[in-house]
Amino acid sequence: MNHPAELQVFSYLQKAMNGEATMTEEVANQVASDVKAALDKQFNSPPRDEFKLRMSNIGKPKCQLWFEKNDPEDKIPLPPHFLINMLLGDLVEAVFKGLLRASGAEFKDNDNVTLKLPDGQEIQGEYDMEMDGKIDDVKSASPWSYTNKFDSFESLQKGDGFGYIPQLVGYSKAAGKEVGGWWVVNKGNGEFKYVSASEVDSEQVIQDIQETVNYIEKDEPFKRCFEPVPETYFKKQSGNLVLNSACKFCSFKHKCWKGLKTLPSRVSKAKNPPEVDYVLIGDGLAT
């Protein structure tokens, strides 16, 4: 375990399962209040029609932000179940904070902050919590992300397409606190862990945020951040080019790559092959 509070929550859950611990009405009421606030936010907040750089999006690839600002009408519509996914994240945060409180772990709850950048711009956002003088985020993760992306800070840094690292550093800088890490809950089975971001180069991250803000504000010409990669099967190239993994969940991938085809894998031998985004098909197989 990477944080003392991990052991506190684990111990509390073990005692609760053995009938040796309960949850106070005060803690339960706070969880209920947080859940109510989450429902209100997801179902009663007005839509965000106007593009704005926020702490929650400032770490996304510049090419994606460019489209968000300059070509929003070509965005792939989000499916209705996306709202449930967002709500699940809020519910996980509410319940996990309740477990922290019930276990005796002390922390300060979420707060709104403003990041003042070196060139004078300001970015607003709301962090999840402060513990031991450090800013932490609570994340719900799929089983794959829990095991692979949130395995360590290094793993997250290699594929941080959602900008979790800049987001956390931005919150910490704005709050005048140290960078903490992420409390990650596996949506598949309830496992949880703490992933520390103590190794982060905060100065470099702030510099990257500044460059992103300048790029978007100056309306510079569009430029892709990623190139397609060769498709491989057992380390052998198929002759096809597929979308970079960083682009997989981008809502503008079809606008960015004309002729992009999302097809069942052309190399997989599985009964139900996974879908792959093909930029170029050159394997010679019949389409």
Label every model-predicted segment:
Residues 2-5, 35, 58, 163, ...:
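Alpha-helical protein-protein interaction elements
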Residues 13-15, 46, 54, 69-70, ...:
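Generic signature of intrinsically disordered, low-complexity segments enriched in small/polar residues
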Residues 23, 158-160, 170-287:
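Metal-dependent nuclease catalytic regions and adjoining charged, substrate-binding loops involved
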Residues 91, 95, 124, 163-170, ...:
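Short, well-structured alpha-helical interface segments that form or flank functional binding sites
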